[in-house]
Design a protein with these regions (language model features):
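Cysteine-nucleophile amide-bond enzymes
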Residues: 1-153
């Protein structure tokens, strides 16, 4: 058994898939990456985020488990991505795991916050109960668990 006081590693995966919605976000923001996911089980996943539930349809969208591999390749190109590692205490890691597990167990309750994502373009944050967009979900988990102190732009 390992030492339970050792730091644990979580992973933040940023991607830009080339879907029409990703291209729209990229055009509006000029950000290199347009999607965020969080993983707790190593650099190859699984990762959790708010995204489309089916690869060929933009809707419905909600809380999904993402596997890297096929998702990081399309028929046209490889998907640009960036993987960050963050060391956290065992308590924060456990808190993140509990939060993600609880939400994923009730994933039908959660919906994609399309209005919230669109309102970001106008710097007007829109929080809706049980609605998230990808970076809102990841940032909320990091903030609520105490993993990072995040300020709003």
């Amino acid at each position: 058994m390992g030492n339970t006081t050792e730091a644990r590693t979580i992973y933040i995966l940023l991607t830009r898939s080339g879907t029409w919605f990703s291209r729209l976000i990229h055009l509006a923001t000029a950000d290199s990456y347009t999607h965020a996911s969080i993983g707790l089980d190593g650099p190859i996943g699984p990762f959790y985020s708010f995204a489309r539930k089916y690869s060929h349809f933009a809707l419905p969208a909600g809380l999904v488990e993402e596997q890297i591999g096929p998702e990081l390749r399309t028929k046209r190109q490889q998907v640009p991505c960036c993987l960050y590692e963050l060391s956290v205490s065992p308590e924060i890691y456990a808190s993140l795991r509990r939060q993600i597990s609880a939400m994923y167990a009730q994933r039908q309750r959660y919906h994609y916050n399309l209005l919230g994502a669109l309102s970001c373009f106008f710097n007007l944050p829109l929080d809706r109960r049980d609605h998230y967009f990808c970076s809102q979900f990841v940032a909320g988990l990091l903030r609520d668990s105490g993993a990072l102190e995040l300020s709003k732009p």
